């Protein structure tokens, strides 16, 4: 058996958009019920893609502003980024373009990115829709996600739910493909 190829996947986005749930649900096949803000955490998943053994390192990051100086330390040697926002949090969607995309481009301009709309299960939730309506907002549409992905030159836009696992595996499969099957460049992250 050949040695495993190591892929470092870093998940970024605003606090409370579901980054940790995304990773735990994928890595452990269970949805964590309690919200615990992340400072930094990582997980490893061993899998195969075709005839290749993969060691997928999943790096969780803190989205809160107070970690802006610390967070980029986790970007070193990243192979792919998942830039996440909550489908039912328009501010987190706007922050992809104003905060997260510029941050990735500053530190790791050559590393592929996938834009991920999280909490897909809440898009049609009556309680969530009522709260959004009270503030004059609506859930982010698939079309809006695709448009933003084009603007930030992400490889793809995907939507998923960590709670129901809808499209969850596909997000990570796409991330792995982006590293293995797109012309592989040496990770060029500049972290000082």
UniProtKB/Swiss-Prot annotation:
* UniProt: GTP binding residues: 13-20, 60-64, 118-121
Membrane topology, record value: Lipid-anchor
Q: Name one GO cellular component term.
A: cytosol
Cite the positions of S-geranylgeranyl cysteine lipidation. Answer: 189
- Subcellular localization(s) per the UniProt record: Cell membrane
| Superkingdom of source | Eukaryota
Show which residues constitute the signal peptide.
none
According to the UniProt entry, its GO molecular function terms are: GTP binding; GTPase activity; protein domain specific binding; protein kinase binding
Q: Where is this motif: Effector region?
A: 35-43
- Cysteine methyl ester (modified residue): where? 189
Q: Has UniProt tagged this entry with the keyword Membrane?
A: yes
Subunit details:
Interacts with pakB.
Q: Which PANTHER family does the UniProt entry name for this protein?
A: RHO FAMILY GTPASE (PTHR24072)
Protein name, as recorded: Rho-related protein racC
Q: Which organism is it from?
A: Dictyostelium discoideum
Q: What is the lineage of its organism?
A: Eukaryota, Amoebozoa, Evosea, Eumycetozoa, Dictyostelia
Q: Which gene encodes it?
A: racC
